[in-house]
Amino acid sequence: AHVAMLLGAAAVLSRVRDRLPGTVVFIFQPSEETPPGGALAMINEGVLDAPKVDAIFGLHVFPGEVGRLDYRAGPIMAS
């Protein structure tokens, strides 16, 4: 589901890219549920450097109430 959601967001945002200020980067993290995960390796290889990333929005599939979206600022789960 993670990959499908990010690909869906990429498809939608690509249709309105001329109305989006700045650059949007879609990052697919390998091994995000398996320790040690892939985030640190990606950071060490420069995924946040070119283009420079100013903000990240993450998404995770989590069982909950149908039709409800939970969110918060700052670190959560493995972030």
Task: Give the residues covered by each predicted segment.
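Histidine/acidic-residue-rich, glycine-tolerant segments that coordinate divalent metal ions
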Residues: 1, 7, 13, 19-79
